[in-house]
Amino acid sequence: MHPAAEHSPLGKSSEYVSTYTPSLLFPIPRAAKWAELGLSADTLPYKGVDYWNCFELSWLLPSGKPVVAIGEFSIPADSPNIIESKSFKLYLNSLNQTPFDDRATLEATLRTDLSAAAGKPVGVRIRSLQEVEAEGVVALPGVCIDDLDISVDSYEHPRPELLRCDASRVVEESVHSHLLKSNCPVTSQPDWGSVVVQYRGAALDHASLLAYLVSFRQHSDFHEQCVERIFLDLQRLLKPERLTVYARYVRRGGLDINPYRSTETADFANHRLVRQ
């Protein structure tokens, strides 16, 4: 467990505050998890963003009438802190009985508070239910590898030694899997996700990638670090010209987290999958 997470509200009984309380936000430094991967703030080999979607966003108009909407928040992958998920939820719940003059005022408030917690500017977008409904759900790009026949006997820790490639062939492709699963390092609750790998480099053996992804099944770590570990393991193996790894996780407590890591510009289309 991350030392800072021990002091967060995650996994503990909490009072649900219904009036605006920005102090509920609990930042967790990324540095410790970066260090586990041999990284530091100055040596990150990727660009990226953590995209959070909130489906339980509500506040009051000056008249007292409630409003509901969907919130989208983009936290830079190189920000000093992540925001602990339960504290994020408690903070958003604190808006429920709080009046705001208009949507722009609420967006500005969210931007200020979340940027202060993350340590870097956070993007905020509040969207109507009709707007998001019209977008529907999308399919992930590329080839789905989930029907490949593999044998698995280890689920406790990621096993990069399972990964194989053909260095004699250079390919450019996108592959994806819906079988990503890990556990919250604080509560041990399952985190279900789908992951996409897009790259140009030595041809990756798809069955070995699937076996590797399944090896995360009982691993305990935050969403962001799982994606960073996958990125680094593939980068070491493939030595690619370009590499992007991103995951879309199933929501919990009205929030879903979607980490994106890439050697290229962080151009992330935030479209929901069928499980979201």
From Swiss-Prot:
One of its GO terms (biological process) is tRNA modification. Homodimer. Its main location: cytoplasm. Its EC number is 1.7.1.13. Catalyzes the NADPH-dependent reduction of 7-cyano-7-deazaguanine (preQ0) to 7-aminomethyl-7-deazaguanine (preQ1). Substrate binds at I83, E84, S85, H223, E224. GO terms for cellular component: cytoplasm. It holds the Pfam family QueF. It is found in: Cytoplasm. InterPro entries: GTP-CH-I_C/QueF, NADPH_dep_7-cyano-7-deazaG_red, QueF, QueF_N, QueF_type2. NADPH binds at S85, K86, R252, G253. Pathway: tRNA modification; tRNA-queuosine biosynthesis. The lineage of its organism: Bacteria, Pseudomonadati, Pseudomonadota, Gammaproteobacteria, Pseudomonadales. Keywords: Cytoplasm, NADP, Oxidoreductase, Queuosine biosynthesis. It catalyses: 7-aminomethyl-7-carbaguanine + 2 NADP(+) = 7-cyano-7-deazaguanine + 2 NADPH + 3 H(+). GO terms for molecular function: preQ1 synthase activity. This is NADPH-dependent 7-cyano-7-deazaguanine reductase. The keyword Cytoplasm applies.
